[in-house]
């Protein structure tokens, strides 16, 4: 059994069904790419895993989302869940404060006040997001002065600072230039040694480069999922082949 499982997961926005009987199993220490055309349910699905959809009043969910064998909607407080299942969004969203304070923000909320401990967490997290060498001499400067790619790696460091087990990434490179994108992709290969990574991407080449497993979403359903090399080179469903080869999407 994987670290995360979904069983017959359905999600509705009011009367509109956005996810239909999603059954997926995510193994620990892997990168899984969620692919599919715009509006197919990838990001909606990602947000069910750490209950971000709770913030939308019209959302109704049935079925199960299991994290380490427990139902995230019944057995977890959402604050604790989001600490253990972190999220990185499409656009970098640094807080308007120093680089140091951005990374220390989460640990402080969770009660860590000792400066030595915070220093250690900040350095470890920035090293974990491959940003430390670029910012170690300006930790007290505003995070808003960083480039877009640096800001996104800062957001990853901020997520790592609270020691999650799973990282959810919603198109984390779509707003970045090719060089910054490459740095994030290289980082993901490192991150999977410590974390389980689930990434939504529209970039087929990116999905092929970075992921161990891939799930193809279409119209709120999972058409096919499995090892990335099988999905890309030996798809079982013609719709998967048509999407990956660019015939639609």
UniProtKB/Swiss-Prot annotation:
The entry's localization annotation reads:
Cell membrane
GO term, biological process aspect, one: phosphate ion transmembrane transport
Keywords in UniProt for this one?
ATP-binding, Cell membrane, Membrane, Nucleotide-binding, Phosphate transport, Translocase, Transport
UniProt cross-references to Gene3D superfamilies, sorted A to Z = P-loop containing nucleotide triphosphate hydrolases
Topology in membrane: Peripheral membrane protein
Top EC class, one word: translocase
User: Binding of ATP: at which residues?
Assistant: 36-43
Subunit? The complex is composed of two ATP-binding proteins (PstB), two transmembrane proteins (PstC and PstA) and a solute-binding protein (PstS).
Name of the featured protein = Phosphate import ATP-binding protein PstB
| Native source species | Clostridium acetobutylicum (strain ATCC 824 / DSM 792 / JCM 1419 / IAM 19013 / LMG 5710 / NBRC 13948 / NRRL B-527 / VKM B-1787 / 2291 / W)
Q: Which gene encodes it?
A: pstB
């Amino acid at each position: 059994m994987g670290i995360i499982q979904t069983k017959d997961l359905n999600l509705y926005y009011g009367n509109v069904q956005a996810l239909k009987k999603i059954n997926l199993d995510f193994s620990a220490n892997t990168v899984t790419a969620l692919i599919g055309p715009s509006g197919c349910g990838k990001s909606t699905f990602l947000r069910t895993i750490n209950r971000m959809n709770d913030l939308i009043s019209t959302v109704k969910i049935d079925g199960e989302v299991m994290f380490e064998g427990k139902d995230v909607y019944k057995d977890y407080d959402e604050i604790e869940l989001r600490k253990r299942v972190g999220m990185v969004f499409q656009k970098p969203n640094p807080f308007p404060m120093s680089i140091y304070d951005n990374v220390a923000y989460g640990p402080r909320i969770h009660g860590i006040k000792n400066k030595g401990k915070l220093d250690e967490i900040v350095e470890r997290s920035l090293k974990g997001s491959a940003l430390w060498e670029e910012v170690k001499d300006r930790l007290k400067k505003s995070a808003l002065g960083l480039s877009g790619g640096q800001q996104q790696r800062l957001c990853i460091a901020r997520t790592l600072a609270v020691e999650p087990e799973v990282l959810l990434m919603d198109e984390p490179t779509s707003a970045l230039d090719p060089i910054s994108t490459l740095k994030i992709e290289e980082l993901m290969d490192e991150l999977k040694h410590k974390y389980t990574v689930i990434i939504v991407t529209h970039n087929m080449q990116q999905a092929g480069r970075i992921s161990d497993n891939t799930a193809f979403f279409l119209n709120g359903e999972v058409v096919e999922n499995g090892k990335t090399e099988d999905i890309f080179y030996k798809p079982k469903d013609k719709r998967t082949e048509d999407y990956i080869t660019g015939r639609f999407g």
